[in-house]
Amino acid sequence: MSDIEIKGILGKKLGMTQIFDDENRVVPVTVVEAGPCVVTQVRTKDIDGYEAVQIAFGEIDPRKVNKPESGHFKKAGVTPRRHVAEIRVADASGYEVGQDVTVEIFNEVDFVDVTGTSKGHGFAGGMKRHGFAGQGAAHGNQAAHRRVGGIGGAATPGRVFKGKRMAGRMGNNRVTMQNLKVAKVDTDSNLLLIKGAVPGINGGIVVVKTAVKGGAKA
């Protein structure tokens, strides 16, 4: 594990736009509403066996929160929130229950890792799901233009090997994109502008953390 101090926050992907850098070049960015979050629990190595901080984000009607979750928020002394996530840190002593976590934690951060749920595409064929070339458009091909093709042997081995790329459910997976550059931090609006695309749909929940690999070597 690297010696980089890991910081993290929960946020909502708002969509993509573009900005201009210092040299007037167009930079595509994803706008993330990062926080504000609140610390609902601090895990320590002595009690829990590891160091982590639990943060909560998003408003929710208290009547829609079940009793176990309601009790958890009440114990922390905070109002109920819609989303909860746990961020592993090297040292959790700097956090306190009830403390606010805002986008300001990324003021001195250049690169981040973003985790979200990728767009779901439902049941998809081999060409869409894996980028297969497909088969010939003519010359004897009959209703098999987009089929996968051969998937293995015959009597030997008598089965299809595990991991064979075939048609199936595509997307809706937890995905992490690493070493994305922070283009801008807007503390007044709780917005984080990240260069490039991040996983998920507009309005999807994402976890933004300090890049564990330290960012690109520039």
Swiss-Prot record:
Q: What is the lineage of its organism?
A: Bacteria, Bacillati, Actinomycetota, Actinomycetes, Mycobacteriales
Q: Which family does it belong to?
A: Belongs to the universal ribosomal protein uL3 family.
Keywords associated with the record: Ribonucleoprotein, Ribosomal protein, RNA-binding, rRNA-binding
Q: Which domain of life is it from?
A: Bacteria
Enumerate the Gene Ontology biological process terms.
translation
Q: Which GO cellular component terms are attached?
A: cytosolic large ribosomal subunit
- The protein here is known as Large ribosomal subunit protein uL3
Please describe the quaternary structure of this protein: Part of the 50S ribosomal subunit. Forms a cluster with proteins L14 and L19.
Checking Pfam families in the record gives: Ribosomal_L3
Q: Per its database record, what is this protein's job?
A: One of the primary rRNA binding proteins, it binds directly near the 3'-end of the 23S rRNA, where it nucleates assembly of the 50S subunit.
